[in-house]
């Protein structure tokens, strides 16, 4: 397979930006958590998701732009509803970041500190301090295996016989390379279809075409029920194709994308989307990775 064009067409942080922007939609978030926490996902109330800005963090540490924080109500087994903080730390680089586990702790401690300060200001006499449950997920879409520390105990250096005195935090690591393309294609919902195309990005010509077309055909069901989300996910799939596949493959892939849709309106939309994305990236020199307002 010929080498893809230089990555300046869609910059290095493009995968993180795709993940971050699409997960802002509550249904996409739900579909991701269904893969990560299948036994718990139905207890979260995704109609009440609140994205949390990094403004609550300490002034000298604002976290990382690609990290996502959500407050989501959770209905426990006894019917009690409690807010839960979900951290999603996205990583794509070839060399995993050894500070990732530490970031998850800093987010948790900042959230707990905020809750503590609010409690000090407003709590009634006799009311005990209670902190949110934190669910930390590392979403790794890089090409290799995660080799950096997976827990604080691995990160903290020191005598092994003192390790039990250190803090404990064990994020869930969800690695895209461990997911089969077909399991993503067959999963319920639209967001896994986008992940399937990401997963197949470096595959053979034939395999990528198969996954690309299958994902777009499955996504078409959203066009009539949730068109905004359909547009977002299809744009993400087309952008990923532009980033990962060689220039000489694009005309055929664009033709396949158009033909994958049954409705004429959707075919025209697909063709227009590709032209708009490509023209913006190439002719106008638009830096899609750095532009904060990237419209997926």
Locations of regions flagged by a protein language model:
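Elongated, amphipathic alpha-helical interaction scaffolds
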Residues: 1-296
């Amino acid at each position: 397979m010929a080498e893809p064009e230089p990555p300046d067409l869609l910059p290095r942080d493009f995968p993180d930006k795709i993940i971050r922007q699409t997960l802002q939609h509550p249904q996409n978030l739900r579909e991701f958590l269904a893969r990560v926490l299948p036994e718990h996902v139905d207890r979260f109330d995704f109609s009440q998701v609140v994205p949390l800005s990094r403004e609550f963090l300490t002034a000298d540490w604002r976290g990382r732009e690609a990290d996502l924080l959500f407050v989501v109500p959770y209905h426990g087994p006894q019917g009690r509803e409690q807010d839960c903080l979900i951290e999603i730390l996205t990583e794509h680089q070839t060399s995993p970041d050894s500070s990732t586990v530490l970031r998850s702790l800093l987010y948790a401690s900042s959230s707990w500190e905020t809750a503590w300060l609010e409690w000090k200001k407003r709590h009634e006499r006799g009311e005990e301090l209670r902190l949110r449950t934190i669910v930390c997920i590392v979403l790794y879409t890089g090409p290799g295996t995660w080799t950096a520390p997976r827990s604080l105990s691995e990160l903290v250096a020191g005598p092994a016989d003192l390790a039990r005195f250190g803090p404990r935090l064990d994020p869930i690591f969800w690695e895209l390379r461990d997911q089969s393309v077909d399991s993503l294609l067959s999963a319920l919902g639209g967001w896994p279809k986008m992940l399937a195309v990401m997963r197949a990005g470096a595959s053979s010509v034939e395999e990528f075409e198969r996954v690309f077309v299958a994902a777009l055909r499955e996504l078409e069901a959203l066009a009539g029920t949730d068109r905004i989300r359909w547009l977002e996910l299809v744009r993400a799939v087309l952008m990923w194709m532009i980033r990962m596949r060689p220039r000489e493959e694009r005309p055929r892939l664009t033709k396949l994308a158009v033909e994958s849709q049954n409705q004429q309106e959707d075919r025209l939309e697909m063709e227009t989307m590709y032209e708009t994305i490509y023209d913006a990236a190439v002719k106008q020199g638009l830096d899609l990775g750095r532009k904060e307002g990237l419209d997926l």
